[in-house]
């Protein structure tokens, strides 16, 4: 199922090309000639990543007068909230101290909640329409940033490659924002990043482990099936599938957030392996229910409608800023002079489900959440720019937080407001001929003025009502 390859080479010789990226690029250059990236010009603000945070960063900056490039490696916008992944939006918007933040997210957010629903549920067209309406945004869909050109500790340009035709483009900019989730831009630019759990002693976090490790929250491969009027068959997984029985199978029609894999793997280096295992579990489960389950007659007319081919990620690299948000900031709470948008989600840590760990040690696929209450907390601006790369912001789940604090800040409505703040900060930088750190040291009052106003429209229907519990299932909506 879902077999794939990166490239097809047709040849009359017995010579086999290598599998590495460098060998592939050398072969392509030899066959097609060297390719110089097409120069797409200079932008005020280059946003890499077209998920919720990237969209909001681009929109906010564009509405405040910046010339913006928005680069997205998929052909749809929305990231985890797109029809490719289908995760609902979590968290609250429009809360103090800057209640105007979030109206921008309301413009692009779907008007329905829930995970793993039909494609229309996630309203990809709504997001795209709002972005295309902004004359200051140039959108590059299907482009992956693969190279970074720096001058000292400043990014000058990026090179991006289009997925299907392998066309290469060059985007120069004064300011950049890493909204990739996995912090790809930051890593290529040499910014310090973290991944995994910090030791308890490093920040004094009571929820942290005694020793640091590489454990992360995992990814969810969403899927669902439906009961139709027509019977159908599905290949029996007895010879190829996951070992399942009446005790270990999870006979559900829809995978929700707790179908989670890859917690013990490297979320960047092992991304393909993690995704494949999640799909393997999905197909194996459906096959077992169709062919060997004791109640398989109930599944006679059940059709597997959709399996995500893109991982719904929660955590990977986090970029280190001038401040690293920690558990105590959220639970005491500790206020900072550079407070911005507010995180409202509880500290939501995921771990392998104990029973599932016993059944599949080291290869778990079910998780459980451990929730720690917080007070609503305004995030410090210093968490939104790199301490190393002078002209790079970040927005989304890759901001400057510990593993524990990420449990609260990672949900998408919060990430959207972070993006809005970053877009505002970029506009202040352009107005003042400043860099991201200068906003904190010198021009924070300018940012405050913008945050009081917001950049979202208030004359459109308000659809982003908060639900801590998903009314369509027995588990929380977006975890």
Language-model features, listed with the residues they occupy:
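Flavin (FAD/FMN)-binding glycine-rich loop and adjacent Rossmann-like elements that form
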Residues: 32, 36, 80, 104, ...
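N-terminal Rossmann-fold NAD(P) dinucleotide-binding loop
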Residues: 54
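Extracytoplasmic
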Residues: 1-37
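Conserved N-terminal/central alpha/beta ligand/cofactor-binding core
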Residues: 60, 66-67, 72-154, 194, ...
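Beta1/beta-strand and adjacent pyrophosphate-binding region of the FAD-binding site
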Residues: 39-51
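Conserved beta-strand elements of the Class I
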Residues: 44-46, 69, 393
């Amino acid at each position: 199922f879902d077999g794939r390859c990166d490239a097809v080479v047709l040849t009359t010789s017995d010579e086999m090309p290598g599998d590495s990226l460098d060998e592939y690029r050398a072969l392509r250059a030899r066959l097609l000639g060297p390719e110089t990236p097409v120069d797409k010009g200079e932008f005020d603000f280059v946003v890499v990543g077209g998920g919720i945070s990237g969209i909001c960063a681009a929109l906010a900056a564009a509405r405040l007068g910046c010339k913006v490039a928005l680069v997205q490696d998929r052909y749809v916008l929305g990231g985890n909230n797109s029809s490719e992944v289908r995760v609902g939006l979590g968290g609250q918007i429009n809360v103090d101290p800057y209640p105007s933040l979030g109206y921008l997210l309301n413009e692009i957010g779907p008007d329905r909640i829930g995970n793993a629903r039909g494609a229309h549920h996630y309203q990809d067209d709504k997001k795209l329409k709002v972005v295309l309406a902004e004359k200051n945004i140039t959108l590059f869909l299907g482009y992956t940033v693969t190279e970074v050109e720096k001058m000292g500790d400043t990014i000058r340009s990026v090179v991006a490659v289009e997925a299907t035709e392998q066309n290469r483009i060059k985007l120069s900019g004064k300011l950049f924002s890493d909204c990739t989730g996995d912090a790809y831009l930051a890593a290529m630019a040499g910014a310090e990043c973290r991944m995994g759990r910090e030791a308890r002693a490093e920040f004094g976090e009571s929820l942290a482990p005694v020793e640091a490790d590489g454990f992360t929250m995992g990814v969810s491969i969403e899927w669902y099936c439906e009961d139709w009027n027509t019977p159908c068959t599905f290949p029996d997984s007895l010879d190829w599938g996951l070992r399942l029985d009446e005790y270990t199978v999870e006979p559900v029609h829809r995978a929700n957030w707790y179908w989670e894999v890859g917690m013990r793997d490297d979320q960047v280096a092992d991304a393909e392996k993690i995704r494949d295992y999640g799909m393997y579990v999905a197909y194996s489960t459906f096959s077992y229910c169709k062919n060997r389950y004791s109640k398989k007659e109930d599944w006679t007319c059940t059709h597997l409608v959709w399996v995500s081919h893109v991982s719904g990620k929660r955590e990977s690299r986090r970029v280190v800023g001038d401040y690293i948000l920690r558990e105590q900031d959220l639970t005491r709470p500790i206020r900072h002079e550079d407070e911005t948008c507010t995180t409202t989600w509880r500290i939501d840590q995921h771990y392998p489900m104990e029973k599932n760990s016993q059944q599949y040690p080291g290869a778990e696929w079910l998780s459980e959440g451990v929730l720690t209450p917080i007070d609503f907390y305004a995030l410090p601006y210093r968490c939104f720019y790199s301490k190393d790369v002078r002209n790079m912001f970040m927005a989304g789940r890759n901001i400057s937080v510990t593993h524990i604090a990420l449990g609260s800040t990672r949900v998408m409505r919060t990430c959207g407001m972070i993006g809005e703040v970053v877009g505002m900060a970029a506009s202040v930088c352009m107005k003042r001929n400043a860099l991201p750190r200068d906003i904190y040291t010198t021009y924070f009052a300018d940012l405050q003025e913008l945050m009081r106003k917001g950049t979202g429209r208030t004359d459109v229907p308000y659809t982003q009502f908060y639900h801590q519990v998903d009314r369509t299932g027995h588990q929380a909506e977006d975890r």
